């Protein structure tokens, strides 16, 4: 199937029975004048009637769970599961986006892309096959009115997308793929010559080039295939054709960064770790740690 056919087919996902009522709520949201602050909290403010404030809250509440954020929309504070500014602020000193074509693979509701607007990229394109996250993005962008393009596509579509990027962000995706080297090759195919990738993934401690292959779940996440040592990750990247591999940071996931709030449904990090030993998951594996790396395609 051609990429345009896939895009058309997936736009139909917005009519799924669990998504269509949310799209209807979104379609009833009026256009209003507002101010937008693209800081740690993406804040939308303005003088609106109380009835619209209530409509905003009810619409946002219906769109739970909110994984990335936070957002403040006319006083409705969307306290997302992740304090996404912690990761964004860690990466921001390392990138230059001005005048560049930028992609965010696995963009969720677009929090990082909204933040990136302050760097004046030429274009911003998000890839994520979730119609719920796309609807959350459309809700926020209804007020932000950005030119961000959001595609209901996955990383496997990047090579066929028809546009190449100067910078690609791929945060928290690699461990969900059963063939991580193939995924890294797809990302490389989406880069212009000299382009950069900012990648983060789970890792385990160790000097050997090996990877943990969890059973049914890792930290109660069902689709984690491989958790490599940093040396194994570097070898994967080399096998995918990346000669430049720079470690930017390593960091354990903390209760400050990821926690249960009323804006999500179900459990969060505190439920995923062994209560007797928070350095282990409930399955007995090493607790989640992330490594942040920069990859570069040769000119």
From Swiss-Prot:
InterPro entries: CmoB (IPR010017), Mo5U34_MeTrfas-like (IPR027555), SAM-dependent_MTases_sf (IPR029063). It comes from the Bacteria. It catalyses: carboxy-S-adenosyl-L-methionine + 5-hydroxyuridine(34) in tRNA = 5-carboxymethoxyuridine(34) in tRNA + S-adenosyl-L-homocysteine + H(+). Carboxy-S-adenosyl-L-methionine binds at residues 68, 82, 87, 106, 128-130, 155-156, 175, 290. GO terms for biological process: tRNA wobble uridine modification. Keywords: Transferase, tRNA processing. Its EC number is 2.5.1.-. One of its GO terms (molecular function) is transferase activity, transferring alkyl or aryl (other than methyl) groups. Belongs to the class I-like SAM-binding methyltransferase superfamily. CmoB family. Catalyzes carboxymethyl transfer from carboxy-S-adenosyl-L-methionine (Cx-SAM) to 5-hydroxyuridine (ho5U) to form 5-carboxymethoxyuridine (cmo5U) at position 34 in tRNAs. Homotetramer. This is tRNA U34 carboxymethyltransferase.
